[in-house]
């Protein structure tokens, strides 16, 4: 995107992007030997970080408060917070030339944050000429159980195994809350590995802990290479949350543990290890699953179910619908 084209994002989303690219820059500084190529890579990293800092941002408004709109030319855009598997997602009311367009982006009603979906639509999505809604599950048929049910199922299997690895996304605040709640019910120590996981949890805790009454407060303990906590973890058991790029560390950490006592909870889209195209692009998820003899899939989609999409259309009653 050309630098003179303004870009807009929520503050939470901007913070996550800055965390990601700052970590990439640190990795490039540490992993690459000094060379002309390294200099170019680091310059590119700095340019990306600078560009993200220049994004136009908005703060999420308090519940029952109309969000502030912004203008791009003669187009008025109003962002409305919604639940999705990536933190700080929004729907948009777009008003121009006497027309009102509601663009949902990705959304769902079965997460902890999904309870605001229908009240928001009832209150603000009136007289809509065009509804543009996601339709991911229409072609994929994803399972859409409640996020609270994900947590309940996790707690059950966590109680049956001494050592539990949870493969999950660092940017899914609701899934991390499910893992936390499940581990507490199973009376397991909570740990994480990975720089992005740690930074994301700090962002979530800072921004959301108070308003969520502690649901989104994350105080997992970090564990890394040659960590003195490893001995205690092997003795008492643990729940470790990690991303797919940390398989080597997790395998090393599990060396010497009885394989019958180790469980992998795969908590991500199953297409990452089933779809040949996805595997070709990134085999990390498949490789992670295949490294463990005991694996259980406990996941729910980050996208709206068919029933949810229908209800959204019924509430909005648009003149036209485009499903993407």
Where are these regions (language model features)?
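Short, small-residue-enriched loops and turns at beta-alpha junctions
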Residues: 110, 138-141, 271-276, 302-303
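Mobile, glycine- and charge-enriched loop segments
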Residues: 124, 259-265, 273-302
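Residues that form or flank phosphate/diphosphate-binding pockets in enzymes
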Residues: 86-89, 174, 249-250, 275-276, ...
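Internal alpha/beta domain cores that form substrate/cofactor-binding pockets in large enzymes
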Residues: 272-275, 295-324
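Hard-cation-handling environments
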Residues: 140-265, 283, 289-291, 308, ...
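Active-site flanking residues adjacent to catalytic metal/cofactor-binding acidic residues
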Residues: 105, 133, 242, 266-267
């Amino acid at each position: 995107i050309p630098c003179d084209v303004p870009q807009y994002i929520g503050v939470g989303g901007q913070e996550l992007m800055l965390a990601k690219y700052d970590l990439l820059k640190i990795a490039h500084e540490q992993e690459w030997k000094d060379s002309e190529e390294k200099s170019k890579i680091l310059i590119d990293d700095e340019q990306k970080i600078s560009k993200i800092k220049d994004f136009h941002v908005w703060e999420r408004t308090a519940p029952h408060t109309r969000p502030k709109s912004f203008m791009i030319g003669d187009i008025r855009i109003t962002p409305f917070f919604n639940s999705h598997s990536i933190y700080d997602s929004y729907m948009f009311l777009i008003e121009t030339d006497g027309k009102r367009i509601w663009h949902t982006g990705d959304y769902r009603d079965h997460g902890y944050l999904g309870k605001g979906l229908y009240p928001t639509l009832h209150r603000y999505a009136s007289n809509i000429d065009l509804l543009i809604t996601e339709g991911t599950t229409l072609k994929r048929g994803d399972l859409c159980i409640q996020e609270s049910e994900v947590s309940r199922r996790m707690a059950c299997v966590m109680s049956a195994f001494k050592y539990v690895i949870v493969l999950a996304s660092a940017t899914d605040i609701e899934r991390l809350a499910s893992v936390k709640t499940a581990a507490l019910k199973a009376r397991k120590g909570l740990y994480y590995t990975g720089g992005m996981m740690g930074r994301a949890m700090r962002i979530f805790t800072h921004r959301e802990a108070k308003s969520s009454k502690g649901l989104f407060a994350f105080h997992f303990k970090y564990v890394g290479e040659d960590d003195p906590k490893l001995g205690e973890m092997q003795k008492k058991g643990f729940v470790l949350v990690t991303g797919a790029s940390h398989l080597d560390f997790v395998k090393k950490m599990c060396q010497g543990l009885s394989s019958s006592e180790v469980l992998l909870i795969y908590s991500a889209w199953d297409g990452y290890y089933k779809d040949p195209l996805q595997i070709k692009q990134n085999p990390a998820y498949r490789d992670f699953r295949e490294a463990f003899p005991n694996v259980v899939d406990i996941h729910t989609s980050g996208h709206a179910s068919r029933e949810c999409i229908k209800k959204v259309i019924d509430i909005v009653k648009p003149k036209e619908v485009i499903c993407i």
